[in-house]
Amino acid sequence: MESSDVLTLISQINQQQTMDLALLGEFIDSVANRNIDINYVEQWLKAVHSNGISVDETTILTKGMMESGSIITWQDNTLVVDKHSTGGVGDKMSLMLAPALAACGVKVPMLAGRGLGHTGGTIDKLESIKGFNCSLNPQQMQDQVEEIGCCIAAQNAAIAPADGLLYAIRDVTSTIDSIPLITASIISKKAAEGLGSLVLDVKCGQGAFMQSFGDAEALAKSMVGAAQGLGIKTIAQITQMDYPIGRYVGNSLEILGSIAVLNGHGSSDTRELVVLQGAALLVLSGTASDEFAGQAMMNNVLDNGEALAKFKQMCLAQGVSQPDVELLITEPTKLLANSKQVTSIESTSQ
């Protein structure tokens, strides 16, 4: 891409004019192929961060980033669903949600990330399970989902490669908190899964990246707009993150908490979020007639062992040995690394 064309885009953003969409497409291709001067990418990111871009431009950016890599295609994506959380302390819903939804009859090709800032990543948590392989390519993801209904895989270079470079540069240019850039980064990868429905869990509070309700609402609206613009049925749930979720914080500890919920017990706040998010996806996909029916389906698979059985299938499919899977379910503390020191802190409130 010619440097003059990038400068044209930057000038249009700075003057709050609509970007030339053809040039924007060329820019995304150049980023994905790594044949653009990094200095120009930095300037473009800073312009977006300072001035913002429209919902339509954000959708075009997201679509271009999605199309920069592999896209999973399904014969019928009506029942293909996923969720994304902006992250928080003790936020481990994906570990239970994917198998529970699969047990309800929908397909969950979940791409997940590693820890960011003070929040733990789903992939880091799964890798605390001995043998669990999160490195699946798009074809492996699709094959596993067709076979057992769900997978949880790490983001990889095949999916939205343009995001890889943009994200790395955002990190060193203090543009991480740009709502259009956050939106494009998240939704481009989710859209590449070939989804029919998506639920966004936008955390708000002291332990969240978006601490004010206004910021959380703005991000939620931006992501919903971009996803719907790409034809994905999408809703956002703004949930509180002033306190940790559940009774465990830490990679292997949150696996313990998740297994407890999959066994039909565990912390009530964790289960409540899993049921809430799962029910919304069941309604969006047409699997449940309304929220009450969706919640009943989710509660049923958590109580009757079907969600736990799907979790075991997922572990086996992704490299965990049969003996270790059985140990993980029955005596997880014998398989997972234990904390070297435990301190109990009693509440002073009644």
Where are these regions (language model features)?
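Phosphate/diphosphate-binding glycine-rich loops and adjacent basic-rich segments that engage nucleotide
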Residues: 146-193
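Glycine/serine-rich anion-binding loops at beta->alpha junctions
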Residues: 79-102, 106-118
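Active-site-proximal beta-alpha loop/turn segments in soluble metabolic enzymes
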Residues: 45-48, 125, 163-172, 201-210, ...
